Regions:
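Short, polar/acidic, helix-capping and beta-turn segments at strand->helix junctions
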Residues: 1-113
Length: 113
């Protein structure tokens, strides 16, 4: 299809399956996971049209944004950054999103002549 729904991603350490102590590393891990999911489905990060970030420590807003910006080459998708209670496995960030594949232009009736 032309739409991909990305379920909640956490930035967990692959060895421990817990959030790392380093906030920047966790932000990179969560965004790397989103990118892997998006690209494995044949989409690009720039196909994301909506992203929701749940954050258990809202003081990490600027840190997350600094990492987040590096994953997009065009404009940014619409985004909500929501302060939340405790997330599973000690995570500070949970990310979900919606990607829509850009459709190739179709030839109109004049092109069929």
């Amino acid at each position: 299809g032309d739409t991909l729904y990305v379920a909640g991603h956490l930035g967990l350490d692959p060895q421990t399956q817990l959030a790392p102590a380093d906030v920047e590393l966790e932000a990179r891990l969560v965004m790397d996971g989103v990118k892997r999911t998006v690209e494995s489905a044949g989409f690009r990060m720039d196909d994301l049209v909506s992203v929701t970030v749940f954050c258990s420590d809202i003081s990490q807003y600027d840190t997350f944004n600094r990492i987040y910006r590096g994953y997009f080459s065009g404009g940014f998708p619409a985004r909500a950054f929501i302060g939340s209670g405790t997330l599973v496995r000690g995570a500070r960030f949970e990310v979900l999103g919606v990607a829509v594949r850009a459709k190739a232009p179709t030839a109109g009736p004049a092109a069929a002549r």
